[in-house]
Design a protein with these regions (language model features):
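Bacterial N-terminal signal peptides that target proteins for export
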Residues: 1-11
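Conserved aromatic-histidine-acidic binding/catalytic patches
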Residues: 10, 28, 330
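C-terminal motif of bacterial Sec signal peptides marking the signal peptidase cleavage site
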Residues: 18-21
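Flexible, low-complexity junctional segments that flank or bridge functional domains
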Residues: 23-258, 449-482
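C-terminal "post-core" interaction segments
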Residues: 221, 225-236, 251-258, 267-482
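P-loop NTPase catalytic core of nucleic-acid-dependent motor ATPases
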Residues: 261
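Short strand-turn motif at the edge of the Rossmann-like AdoMet-binding core
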Residues: 264
Length: 482
């Protein structure tokens, strides 16, 4: 940090002398008002992956608030660096108090345009509901369409009312299809009671499915965030890593033959979580090998690091030869790292839609100024030096759940993506895949995977926006605390 102090002081002294030469000496005032932005710039000049693309800014920009100044420094190649502002109460308590509990109604949703194309309104479709949450007690469930909030249409400005508050009234309505039309059915009004502080456990569903055809035991895990513990900004809290060991030990005790890792709603988190999970999924013969390595900018090659499979998790290893991964439009960073890092060792089949494409790592930089920075600091490679997924991974079997009308609950074997993955394991094909020879054939049991008819127009869910209960704003692999 001495190097940074020297940089800041030299810059400030030069500018202060200029101010003093104009008459009144306002050096102290200038230093105080620009100190924060100079601190940010110093950090970025040192560790940022694209430090040589940081622009030279005019003096006036150093008076901007931190959350406005930080984006000015970013490269045009950078889609993922961000800054998280903390309120005074949170900052004074230290980072360990951040997001311990989420005060929420307990619904994760996606915003979309009107799938019937009969209005210009937006609608929210529920992706899942947290157990024992206010939304669950109100009777909301996965797949429900929310048409209004407090008797008002949903917009980009008011959808936050679905996340938290002292209670909210929503209406839900089904979509009625005929051979020629799609229309909204009769609406039902539902009152959700006040939001509650809830633990958002990343292990949403953990099940063992026994195939009625072959008798195979198939492990199924819906994992929603690579977070070490109940305090996401504190990697020293490892409570969820310990729970991960318990979850996989159960899979091992049951002798699972195949494994389905559902990452459709997981957009990343800490690399040590991905390292731990990969250790438990990989073939046992690979456990002395490399998991991934990070390459930093040319000034900070000292930070380059190779992650091996973690021996602390080897006793829970399932010794798999093949892994089935379910992906969605939010599957990113550490989720993609799992795919990329395991492919040199085993057959990884991807079913779902194109992933986001985050082959870079961020570093968490805690500041003394009530914010945390997450700049991109490294490119992530697997053991074969491959990192060519900046545009995302294309699935082996493409199925977009947003194109379908009827959704079963996650973990239900009739649920679209799970059904197709189970069919792939048993019969070698995914019936509903757009890029499969069997596309358009058998569908997933009863109404669980009934396709929307051709006139059902929500085949692109526009203006997608997640609620905040799973902290979907975290955009990249979090490598280290700095």
């Amino acid at each position: 940090m001495k190097r940074f102090s020297k940089f800041i002081n030299t810059s400030l002294i030069a500018l202060a002398l200029l101010l003093a030469s104009c008459g009144e000496d306002r050096t102290g005032e200038f230093i105080a008002k620009t100190e924060v932005d100079h601190w940010i710039e110093a950090q970025m000049q040192d560790i940022y992956l694209w430090y040589n693309e940081i622009p030279k800014l005019e003096t006036s920009y150093y008076f901007y608030p931190a959350d406005e100044f930080f984006p000015m420094l970013l490269s045009s190649n950078d889609k993922f660096s961000y800054i998280e502002m903390l309120d005074q109460e949170t900052a004074s308590a230290g980072t360990k108090s951040i997001h311990i509990n989420s005060t929420t109604y307990g619904i994760e949703f996606v915003l979309t345009n009107d799938p019937t194309q009969t209005t210009s309104h937006q609608y929210a479709r529920i992706l899942y509901v947290l157990k024992n949450s206010p939304a669950a007690r109100a009777g909301l469930k996965r797949g429900d369409w929310i048409t209004t909030i407090n008797s008002k249409n949903l917009t980009q400005d008011n959808y936050g009312l679905l996340e938290t508050g002292n209670g909210v009234t929503v209406t839900i309505a089904p979509i009625i299809l005929t051979e020629q039309t799609a229309s909204w059915g009769e609406a039902t009004e539902i009152q959700i009671q006040a939001a509650e502080a809830m633990e958002n456990n990343p292990f949403l569903v953990s099940e063992i499915i026994t195939s009625p055809q072959s008798g195979k035991k198939i492990g199924y895990l819906v994992y929603n965030e690579f977070v070490t513990g109940k305090t996401p900004n504190d990697p020293t809290d490892t409570s969820y890593l310990e729970e991960m060991k318990t979850v996989f030990q159960n899979f091992k005790n049951e002798g699972v033959d195949d494994f389905i890792l559902d990452l459709r709603y997981n957009n990343g988190g800490y690399i040590q979580c991905a390292q731990a999970m990969a250790t438990m999924l990989a073939p046992a013969s690979s456990l002395n090998g490399e998991f991934a390595h990070l390459v930093h900018n040319d000034k900070r090659q000292d930070l380059n690091y190779t992650y091996m499979f973690d021996s602390n998790y080897s006793s829970e290893n399932l010794n798999l030869s093949k892994l089935y991964v379910i992906s969605g439009v939010y599957t990113a960073s550490s989720s993609e790292l799992i795919i990329n890092s395991l492919r040199p060792y085993m057959d990884v089949k991807l079913l779902g839609v194109q992933t986001v494409g985050k082959n870079v790592a961020a570093t968490q930089i805690n500041s003394p100024y009530n914010f945390i920075m997450y700049p991109i600091t490294a490119t992530v490679y697997n053991k074969d030096n491959q990192s060519d997924y900046a545009n995302g991974f294309t699935p082996d079997y493409t199925i977009n759940e947003l194109n379908y009308l009827n959704w079963a609950e996650l973990g239900d074997t009739k649920e679209l993506l799970l059904y197709n993955t189970l069919h792939l394991i048993e019969y070698g094909s995914a019936p509903d895949a757009e890029n499969s020879e069997s596309s358009g054939g058998e569908e997933g049991g009863d109404e669980g995977t009934t396709k929307a008819v051709k006139h059902y127009k929500s085949r692109q869910a526009l203006q997608i926006s997640y609620s905040s209960i799973s902290q979907k704003t975290r955009p990249a692999i979090i490598a280290t605390q700095y």
